Regions:
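Conserved ABC transporter NBD signature motif
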Residues: 60-70, 74, 212
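Conserved ABC ATPase "signature" region
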Residues: 98, 102-125
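Helix-to-loop junction immediately C-terminal to a conserved catalytic motif
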Residues: 52
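Helix N-cap at the start of a conserved alpha-helix in ABC-type nucleotide-binding domains
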Residues: 165-167
Length: 236
């Protein structure tokens, strides 16, 4: 049996006296997909930043691709796709990808950029500055940037936020493609419908704890919704 792509044990993250994550246990098999739901302040983005190696746990353990999440070996295997505003607005689409490729020591960042722009349907706007893109186009460029080093594990923070229906459908299809490619996908979202359709499993965070976890699917949607609403009520 393959080792888990992600393993967390008694994971905690504190900011001063505030506990953002408390005693989180998590195991994500390689090539699987997980949706993480919860109200604002539940700890979703904090968890994702820990998985990306952008922040260190206060206590507990967190291994990604067989290494501590903040180790260079783990970070090289992870693609973090945050909000599209993380793009460089004055750089062209291609320049954004080439720059990211160089940061990740991609051998031929220009060729890799061209491949990704084609895959994301952005080949016709390769020279346009990212700041001129619609929300949907910017999200596609953000995904391309997150994939520039061909990561095994893809982390997405609220990618459906602000998208129109057409762009959201295209993104959902892209997530399914990433899954079929054998990548491990972790999706943070408020969107119950997307959480169910885009992942093998789902969990709900409430005040930094895992309040509920289940296999995703139509049969678990109602139970997942109840857990999400309970977490939202608890946060008020």
């Amino acid at each position: 049996m393959s080792a888990p792509a992600i393993t967390a044990r008694a994971l905690e993250k504190r900011f001063g006296r505030t506990a953002a994550l408390r005693g989180v246990d998590l195991e994500v098999p390689p090539g699987s997909s997980l949706s993480v739901l919860g109200p604002n302040g539940a700890g979703k983005s904090t968890l994702l930043r820990l998985l990306a190696g952008l922040s260190r746990p206060s206590s507990g353990s967190l291994d990604v691709a067989g290494h501590p999440a903040f180790a260079r070996e783990a970070r090289a295997r992870v693609g973090y796709i945050g909000h599209a505003t993380l793009l460089y607005a004055t750089l062209s689409a291609r320049e954004n990808l080439v720059f990211a490729g160089r940061l990740h020591n991609v051998s031929d960042p220009g060729s890799r950029a061209d491949v990704l722009l084609e895959e994301e349907g952005l080949a016709e706007v390769t020279g346009r500055p990212a700041g001129s893109f619609s929300r949907g186009m910017a999200q596609r460029l953000a995904i391309a940037r997150g994939l520039v080093h061909d990561p095994e594990i893809v982390l997405l923070d609220e990618p459906f936020t602000g998208l129109d229906r057409r762009s959201a459908e295209r993104l959902a299809q892209r997530l399914r493609e990433l899954h079929r490619e054998g990548r491990t996908v972790v999706l943070v979202t408020h969107d119950l419908e997307r959480a169910v359709e885009s992942a093998d499993a789902a969990l709900v965070l409430s005040r930094g704890r895992v309040a509920f976890s289940t296999r995703a699917g139509a049969e678990s949607a109602a139970e997942l919704e109840r857990a999400y609403l309970a977490a939202a009520d608890a946060s008020r």
